[in-house]
Amino acid sequence: SSSHMRILSIKNFFRKINNNNIVTISVLTPSVFRKNFDLICSPLHDKDKLKDLKNVLFFEGSLAQVSDLEPDNQIGLIGLGGVNKHFIFHENDLIKQIEYILSLYPKKQWYVFTSRRTPEMMIQKINQLKKIYENISISTEGFDEIIKKASIKIITQDSVNMVYESLSCKGKTILFNMKCKKENKVVKQ
């Protein structure tokens, strides 16, 4: 909210100096002074917050860079979120699904990316898998590069941004089977 206030202050400053109309655009829903923006680009799930405004463009999901790069059939990506309020992050169920994936695609090099929400115990379980499967590695860097190269990307449902980033690249996107805690607008997406 302080950044939105700063932007509007800068707009007023330039308006006084140049005597021109400065256009202000907010990408994502501003928390304050919504009526002062000329245009707001907002996720569809914020529609109720902005129902009184006519200067809003809604988008589905999250903003992600689109890639036309042809995927490499030798590369796969596993994206893990973590504990969240929408889905049950059951580590053992996810490990079983990962083992199944590795058995289906034994020749593919798998890159596992975790998030700051991924429990340490889950990371330890992935490290145990590395002792059995040589074609898996936990990656801390290179996500933007690998997601574009991966021919198949398997992602936990709680990682909404990662899902949309994957859908913005060529290759298959598959979601891990996870149970939702309750039906709401996030799990229905």
Regions found by a protein language model. Name each.
Residues 7, 33-34, 47-50, 85-88, ...:
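Short, charged/polar "capping" segments at the starts of alpha-helices
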Residues 61-120:
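Active-site donor-nucleotide binding/catalytic segment of nucleotide-sugar enzymes
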Residues 1-59, 64:
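Active-site and donor-binding regions of nucleotide-sugar-utilizing enzymes
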Residues 18-23, 106-108, 170-172:
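A short helix->loop->beta-strand "cap" motif at the edges of active sites that frequently abuts
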Residues 40-43, 110-116, 174:
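Short internal beta-strands
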Residues 126-164:
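Donor nucleotide-activated moiety binding/catalytic core segment of transferases
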Residues 167-189:
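Nucleotide-sugar donor-binding patch of glycosyltransferase catalytic domains
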